[in-house]
Amino acid sequence: MAASIGALKSSPSSHNCINERRNDSTRAISSRNLSFSSSHLAGDKLMPVSSLRSQGVRFNVRRSPLIVSPKAVSDSQNSQTCLDPDASRSVLGIILGGGAGTRLYPLTKKRAKPAVPLGANYRLIDIPVSNCLNSNISKIYVLTQFNSASLNRHLSRAYASNMGEYKNEGFVEVLAAQQSPENPDWFQGTADAVRQYLWLFEEHNVLEYLILAGDHLYRMDYEKFIQAHRETDADITVAALPMDEKRATAFGLMKIDEEGRIIEFAEKPQGEQLQAMKVDTTILGLDDKRAKEMPFIASMGIYVISKDVMLNLLRDKFPGANDFGSEVIPGATSLGMRVQAYLYDGYWEDIGTIEAFYNANLGITKKPVPDFSFYDRSAPIYTQPRYLPPSKMLDADVTDSVIGEGCVIKNCKIHHSVVGLRSCISEGAIIEDSLLMGADYYETDAERKLLAAKGSVPIGIGKNCLYKRAIIDKNARIGDNVKIINKDNVQEAARETDGYFIKSGIVTVIKDALIPSGIVI
């Protein structure tokens, strides 16, 4: 991991970058220069603040609004990052760990939502943290409230402060909800969670706060996002996803003017209200064909907020607001603040339900191109180094699947499935369209023999099992001849005492559950 973090490098600078000197109309910003790594951007750069101050430039007046260029507000794959490394490091990343994760239960029974395993080797929290590190944002807080022990352990092992070249100033730190004389309640929502730690966030010498969710699957260059925020002189910039009419009814939609400024919000609109939220998405960079297919934009719950604006909104303007999306952001618009939309036109999935989690994981097995790839060397996804041996497959038939590290797979068939760390799968098993999360530890041969002698079941998948459309959480002990096929096509069922739940027709075996031999689910 140390080598991986040390290999982080800045994206090449575009020839079209604006080597702009902030004039008298630029708001106050800090002159402290930060360092993260020895890598640097080639070509034109934004002028460091210290250089401007030495030339007598003042920073106490707001700049007049700018006309928005589509290139400045979209995450086009043709555009290139042109922020100076110091500029992106003047941003504090704040990742919201989410609520209790009731819709993801039982996966959240013993862990916070961002700690849920993903893609055989990773956890959900690795996505926003890796996006930050790949964007040269090295100061990151993760706010949690429920079951944060495993999340804290993972982050401390994966992103230790003495690793890589960001050791001098970078960190990834968990902030759990706490009670104090000023705030006797737990987090009441996204905005309230940030408000309760404003005293800590404002100590950091940064220009903006980057607010992220801990349960989304996507790959995004935040440097472009931040650059768009600064070039448009926005108070708040909201990441927006283009939507067709079919999906739009499930999201909070936004309406923009010809400059890309947000002027209206609507939460899951229907009928005439939905039609009224149509926008010309060519303003944000889509071509004419895509704009006709995607005439709506939905908030991704990702924001860049200028530091002074955040302090003003949460402390003074809306001291009782609990949520960013439904209260603070619309409130800022009503106050006349400049709230800009930034188009992200790529794969994005909100991992909020069992079905979404299942589909997102199996999506990485899709041919010829997966929904989300962990193989992008220009923007890798980091995780905890475990130093496990390669997976061993003995007479196994494995197709269209992803296999994690340290697995032992014997004479079985696996198709269109994801198999997690340290999975042990015995002879004769057939696994289709399923997600196995693996195990936290190995049992020795002696321990497995002793369990078998006592009539108990070792960790892993027993002989001659059949799984279809199932999720098996970590450390599950499943005996021989077990069938998990949802034979009665049940859509919803809670069988916690029996070790499993069914949601959206997907059978989910609970972590540490014991399923005796011969059981049919």
From Swiss-Prot:
Gene3D superfamilies: Hexapeptide repeat proteins, Spore Coat Polysaccharide Biosynthesis Protein SpsA, Chain A. It is found in: Plastid, Chloroplast. Activated by 3'phosphoglycerate, inhibited by orthophosphate. Allosteric regulation. Keywords: Allosteric enzyme, ATP-binding, Chloroplast, Nucleotide-binding, Nucleotidyltransferase, Plastid, Starch biosynthesis, Transferase, Transit peptide. It catalyses: alpha-D-glucose 1-phosphate + ATP + H(+) = ADP-alpha-D-glucose + diphosphate. Heterotetramer. InterPro entries: ADP-Glc_PPase, ADP_Glu_pyroP_CS, NTP_transferase_dom, Nucleotide-diphossugar_trans, Trimer_LpxA-like_sf. GO terms for biological process: glycogen biosynthetic process; starch biosynthetic process. Its EC number is 2.7.7.27. This is Glucose-1-phosphate adenylyltransferase small subunit, chloroplastic. Belongs to the bacterial/plant glucose-1-phosphate adenylyltransferase family. One of its GO terms (cellular component) is chloroplast. One of its GO terms (molecular function) is ATP binding. Residues 1-24 are annotated as: Disordered. This protein plays a role in synthesis of starch. It catalyzes the synthesis of the activated glycosyl donor, ADP-glucose from Glc-1-P and ATP. Residues 1-72 form a transit peptide. Pathway: Glycan biosynthesis; starch biosynthesis. PANTHER family: GLUCOSE-1-PHOSPHATE ADENYLYLTRANSFERASE LARGE SUBUNIT 1, CHLOROPLASTIC-RELATED, GLUCOSE-1-PHOSPHATE ADENYLYLTRANSFERASE-RELATED.
